[in-house]
Amino acid sequence: MATWNASQIILNSMSNIIESPQSKPRPVMASNGASLFIPVTMEVPCDQGTRMWWAFLASSMVTFFGGLFIILVWRTFKYLWTVCCHCGGKNKEAQKVVNVASSQVTDGDYKPTDDKEEVGVAEVGWMTSVKDWAGVMISAQTLTGRVLVVTVFALSIGALMIYFIDSSNPIESCQNFYKDFTLQIDMAFNIFFLLYFGLRFIAANDKLWFWLEVNSVVDFFTVPPVFVSVYLNRSWLGLRFLRALRLIQFSEILQFLNILKTSNSIKLVNLCSIFISTWLTAAGFIHLVENSGDPWRNFENSQDLSYWECMYLLMVTMSTVGYGDVYAKTTLGRLFMVFFILGGLAMFASYVPEIIELIGNRKKYGGSYSAVSGRKHIVVCGHITLESVSNFLKDFLHKDRDDVNVEIVFLHNISPNLELEALFKKHFTQVEFYQGSVLNPHDLARVKIESADACLILANKYCADPDAEDASNIMRVISIKNYHPKIRIITQMLQYHNKAHLLNIPSWNWKDGDDAICLAELKLGFIAQSCLAQGLSTMLANLFSMRSFIKIEEDTWQKYYLEGVANEMYTEYLSSAFVGLSFPAVCELCFVKLKLLMIAIEYKSEKGESRILINPGNHMKIKEGTLGFFIASDAKEVKRAFFYCKACHDDITDPKRIKKCACKRLEDEQPSALSPKKKQRNGGMRHSPNTSPNMMRHDPLLMTGNDQIDNMDSSSVKRYDSTGMFHWCPAKELDKVLLTRSEAAMTVLSGHVVVCIFGDMTSALIGVRNLVMPLRASNFHYHELKHIVFVGSLDYIKREWETLHNFPKVSILPGTPLSRADLRAVNINLCDMCVILSANQNNIDDTSLQDKECILASLNIKSMQFDDSIGLLQANSQGFTPPGMERSSPDNSPLHGVARQASITTGANIPIITELVNDSNVQFLDQDDDDDPDTELYLTQPFACGTAFAVSVLDSLMSATYFNDNILTLIRTLVTGGATPELEALVAEENALRGGYSTPQTLANRDRCRVAQLALYDGPFADLGDGGCYGDLYCKALKTYNMLCFGIYRLRDAHISTPSQCTKRYVITNPPYEFELVPTDLIFCLMQFDHNASQSRASLSHSSHSSHSSSKKSSSVTSILHTASANRQNRVKARDSRDKQKMGQAEKKWYTDETENNYPRNIQIKPMSTHMANQINQYKSTSSLIPPIREVEDEC
């Protein structure tokens, strides 16, 4: 009956349409009297009481399975055609080959005779071109393809929005296409989707797999129902929610638009899009079945749920909460929930935590640096750890640097740990951290490297492979320079030979401020200077590090040491009041009046080149705009040299009152060198050695035609390297410098340097050349060079020998520094310095064990006992030696008096400097100190005494170089013996020094100052040694001998009134004027090159160690101990004559230090006869005096 009523209603409606096509909808009465309002259109009438969902679903299913059936039939037909015609195809192909061959035989050229083949080829080409065109249209490789892909995605999201709007209506309802605006828009969208589907179908290589793709399935179940809706005048939500699956392609769309560039951002968007699209799609299915009901139950169990309630239900289901307020009632809904909860739970548990982690990390260390107006920033990269960053920030942000208006941006590819993060938060106002790599241009853009003031690259000083670490830093330099060639880069390098690779970078230019701080070069240079003046390594390390002043009231050695530690190196332009004065006069005025210690100036030549001159002497006159190098406690004190005015400040006694006056001076226009930005970019001070021939004093060495040049240097003999900065000899074979233990025992070495090396074939190279070069500087005369004896593994030394074979006075004893027999063979108790180095740092998990060999060797030497007969001999052969003190032999010691304990009976008195890798291991070197393990290195007794050195003290050079690159030039000039960029380029080319002929230009490079220690017990300064003032000593040494004093090396217990047996000394840097001296003090000084030392070895007192001066007062120094020197020379000659007589009986030839007949003034260690060897052994056993074997040498 109900079916008949529905049919009657439809017939009545159709009759109305036929009678009046323009009639409006009107109520139709059913047989049961019910009134139904049905919108009537021209096409098909809509009945609200009838459900037509099957028609919409059938359209999609017919489209999907119909197309799938056609594709399968076509593939089957094609396969059968290929199989059936396979044999026939072979016959045709064979016939074709025969025809071609016959055609070539008759005509000579191949001419196609089958016109049908031409048509086939043309048809295939047309189909291929259409397919290629469709592929280009839908690909993102072209602009058109990208626009089309983005448009399709945007329209899919629009269709999904229309679905959200329609979801508030019933699942199925009557709608007039001409009046429903949303249906019209949805129709337009789906027409576009249909066209795009056709392009994709044409471009697809495999039609079957294309038909089964997710995007194709979405089109099947969303496009056909729209056309059915127009025809039936009714709407069915159906499966339109499948458009949410298009969100999976969101990350691809953003990549096409170049919005997503990093892997983390792509991963984050992928996870979010998959999660959201799955959530929305599942919610749409639940919304459909719950609002429709089960078909087999005649849709009676439906419930009214909005789409958003379904989303809520799916979320609480995935999270396994399940409150129960909303739940599925239909069988289809519950069945779907059973399967969805398995996948949804897995997705929720894996995707959500990962999304939260990515979002958290991205907000923390992502993003880009925002530059602050008026504030500079630097980028720090490389080895970023808690230790390296804390050391860097401690020195860079030190309060003594005045106001540092620079922001520090750290860039590293690993996120910081909690401790490092806390350090960044502590300095959050000046420090920022970004996660990334300098090898990635995108990350360089994030930190604004193009606007950065400089880029600093830190190295891992404790790595197992130094060459690999240097290679990494060089790659960082290449990447940064490739991104921005003009950026200033300061990088740390571990190995000296790797600095050469930086010269291969086209945009690397040290004249523009680029610097490479070679840790091995400077570390070994510091240690080498300690061989010449013990304790100097500690003083220099403290000068170039920022230390806060620590006040101690007790009268202990720590009080005076810490007062000196507070001093640093600064630069400042000199006031015009100093113009025209000589360098010593300015130094005296600054020290006495301004309480400043000036040690060097920057000299600008007429060509505009700049050079750093260290204590140039009284011939140098100060010019306008001269830059001075000062030792002071803070930057404000150095400003006195810039503000000083003779008219206003001449009568002021308090230096704190010297401030800027009202006088108009030219200095006001000069920029301050204390600015964090480097002011001088000409780089001339590093263009050549620190001296220049045209500004040397007029002494006999440089006078043309002088006999000295003819006598000292022949044009046919090479004694110096090509730059004239170092002593040089022809390359020697390794076997010629080897000593056996017996040979070394028969050679009484004295005043030499013993270098103990721990290394093997697998150890990283130390770069011992950097230790030897400062000891072979040309500002020493040949007879002043200390003999160097290496004790260590021969396999390791062979690897280093290529860089050492051009240096004179070098010997090797294969053995181990832990062997007391080897140490006694090289007379370690008579050495001027024992250096302990280690290269065994590989594969050690515990960092505290990296120094085990060096610590064991140091303790081993200190526990050795010696016979004091050798010491008595040395003491008796040298006059004017204070009690408990002894001077080195003038023939072996370059400084004529570096203090050393006489009559050494215990190894504790042997001067030793030990290299440490781990700072905390310094506590094991001295057993009698009370240093706490947590004490900083510079506060420990071994470091204060100059017996320990660690590479960590060089960390401060990074910040010091950034604020003023002249500082690095000064320190390299002081510790390397005169290494220049030209010499580095030469070493990079040949990996060895090249000999050069002696010319006036190269000989002029010898005229540069050197560091020495001045004894106060006897000599011209003896009157000041007992209670005198340090300021009086400073002025007297400067006026009389052009010697610039800058520190004291004092006995540790000198302040104690009772006598002490302790021979340890500590360093006092830049003591004040009124500082009281004691007789046992040794004074650090910068002395001039002595041109007359080659004429007379004993022309100076062993106590004064003063250099030659053009002043007439220099003659008084020669006459002070003339008698003692003459007597000593007579003893030397008598002893040498006896040795020559005994050597005539020798049966064995020993090595010569240089090639025979090549160097007329060579050193020869003369052989001994068997009788003399037995006699020496007898002397050793009976504690008799051993006559030392002297070296026969001529002076150069």
From Swiss-Prot:
Cytoplasmic side: 74-146, 204-207, 254-268, 357-1196
Broad class of where this protein is predominantly found: membrane
Domain of life: Eukaryota
Statement: the UniProt record of this protein carries the keyword Transmembrane helix: yes
Region (Segment S9): 748-768
Chain ranges for the short sequence motif Selectivity for potassium as given in the UniProt record: 320-323
Compositional bias ranges of the Basic and acidic residues kind: 1133-1149
Reactions this protein catalyses: K(+)(in) = K(+)(out)
Region Segment S7, annotated ranges: 524-544
Tissue-wise expression: Expressed in both the somites and neural tube of 1 day embryos. Within the nervous system, it is restricted to dorsal parts, and expressed centrally in regions dedicated to processing of sensory information. Six hours later, it is expressed segmentally within the somites. At this time, it is expressed in a primary sensory organ, the trigeminal ganglion. By 2 days, it is also expressed in other primary sensory organs, such as the otic vesicle, and the eye. Within the retina, it is expressed to an internal layer.
PANTHER family: CALCIUM-ACTIVATED POTASSIUM CHANNEL ALPHA CHAIN (PTHR10027), CALCIUM-ACTIVATED POTASSIUM CHANNEL SUBUNIT ALPHA-1-RELATED (PTHR10027:SF33)
UniProt remark on domains: The S0 segment is essential for the modulation by the accessory beta subunits.
Descriptive protein name: Calcium-activated potassium channel subunit alpha-1
Gene behind this protein: kcnma1
